[in-house]
């Protein structure tokens, strides 16, 4: 795989995020050249310090929605992975700017066409598949967005759904291949230099779940490293063009999900499948190390 990836350039937006940084790490390990975008200079410095690789090129782009914002970063990129997005925390005061999120995917898709990129992979969310009337979630199910809601999680789910819908519209009109990866809650270690492993919103939920899983209503989990591998498959496997990969490896049975596409990919890539116990163990060990062993250990 690394042989075919040599000198192939990939754009990764949101490269300093929990998922984005793992995608960058995997791409670099496979020989790709990575053009990474971040919003702030401090994030750029941490990304460079983390990987220290001459095949990583970091671009500070505060606003992906601005016209031609990606022109320099996307130049020469065969593939584009659009990760940039955040899961809202309960402490977040302001709502989610849905229009900006839609403008960002429009900017990414239009720039990809303008610079002859061959494919876009979009990090979506299980919530985009969440049709409450469907007996099981699958590639064809969709959440019904509600832009009028003041609830932060509804805004998030609506935003992710409207962004993905817009991406598919543009994929069709621009004749640009698209694959989406839609994970459930994501857990695991962080890799950015000096980043607190508890800083990820998903990891905060995972820690609460570990402390008392019986009280958790979270539908399922997947390891962040497995999510990165699914993005790599989406880049490299052209049979996945036009597909929506629903990703959950630890389904708690709260919401029935058809993850057969994901399972078929992981069956070919056994190293990518990280079980839930390892996710918990690796996260807890990293938290202990980050806090110099002062954190109370939670035994799963």
UniProtKB/Swiss-Prot annotation:
One of its GO terms (molecular function) is nucleotide binding. InterPro entries: Epimerase_deHydtase, NAD(P)-bd_dom_sf, NAD(P)_dehydrat-like. Keywords: NADP, Nucleotide-binding, Oxidoreductase. Induction: Expression is strongly induced under conditions of nitrogen starvation. Expression is positively regulated by the cluster-specific transcription factor rua1 that recognizes and binds to the specific 5'-T/G-G/T-C-G-C-A-T-A/T-C/T-C/T-G/A-3' upstream activating sequence found in all promoters of the UA biosynthesis genes. Pfam families: Epimerase. Signal peptide: none annotated. Gene3D superfamilies: NAD(P)-binding Rossmann-like Domain. The active site is at 160 (proton donor). NADP(+) binds at residues 14-20, 39, 63-64, 83-85, 156, 160, 183-186, 199. The keyword Iron-sulfur does not apply. Pathway: Secondary metabolite biosynthesis. Its EC number is 1.-.-.-. The keyword Oxidoreductase applies. Fatty acid hydroxylase; part of the gene cluster that mediates the biosynthesis of the glycolipid biosurfactant ustilagic acid (UA). UA is a secreted cellobiose glycolipid that is toxic for many microorganisms and confers biocontrol activity to U.maydis. UA consists of 15,16-dihydroxypalmitic or 2,15,16-trihydroxypalmitic acid, which is O-glycosidically linked to cellobiose at its terminal hydroxyl group. In addition, the cellobiose moiety is acetylated and acylated with a short-chain hydroxy fatty acid. Belongs to the NAD(P)-dependent epimerase/dehydratase family. Dihydroflavonol-4-reductase subfamily. This is Fatty acid hydroxylase uhd1. It comes from Mycosarcoma maydis. The lineage of its organism: Eukaryota, Fungi, Dikarya, Basidiomycota, Ustilaginomycotina. The gene is uhd1.
